[in-house]
Amino acid sequence: MELFGVPIQTMYLYTLIIAGSLTLLFLFFGDVFSGLSEGIPFLNPTLVLSFFTCFSAGGYIGELVLPLSSLLIALLSCILSIMLVVLLHIFVLVPLSSAEESLAYREDDLRGRLGKVITAVPVDGFGEVVIEGIGGTISKSAVSFDNQQISYGTTVLVVDINNGVLSVTPHEPI
């Protein structure tokens, strides 16, 4: 079969090369076009480019391997591409969009958090406090803010941070 005087296999191959190249460009420079998909979520450029890439790859391979008509190969390729794009959307893009941007934290973010003493804090010395959160568990050196001993297992409140060392005080729940 020919389309615009060009064999359909060649059209599939050209589409594959162009869509694949645009997908790679969008992968590298996608932040520039980040606002394009906000209004209409199903027209996400990642999904559209993935559809054309899968469609043209499926059509090209189908034309080479399958002894079916070109129209049936295009239909099968379209159905396969829609299924792959839906799976990409559900299992990759939706979880990525709802994930936290980073698991990193700033030390200032620890101020006001509750932790638990895992190494007793002596009067004029260092102990260790563990702070649990959504992003994981953070273990930091600690000193007593009130210059008093804090025993193992005590729940503490982070008051200040100096040079990576937490200043903590025992926490009494209200």
From Swiss-Prot:
Q: Belongs to which family? A: Belongs to the NfeD family.
Q: Which GO terms describe its cellular component?
A: membrane raft; plasma membrane
Its taxonomic placement starts with: Bacteria, Bacillati, Bacillota, Bacilli, Bacillales
Q: What induces it?
A: Expression is sigma W-dependent. Up-regulated by alkali shock and by infection with phage SPP1.
Q: What is this protein called?
A: Membrane protein NfeD2
Keyword annotations for this protein, in alphabetical order, are: Cell membrane, Membrane, Transmembrane, Transmembrane helix
The protein's location, in the record's own words, is: Cell membrane; Membrane raft
- So where does this one cross the membrane? 16-36, 47-67, 72-92
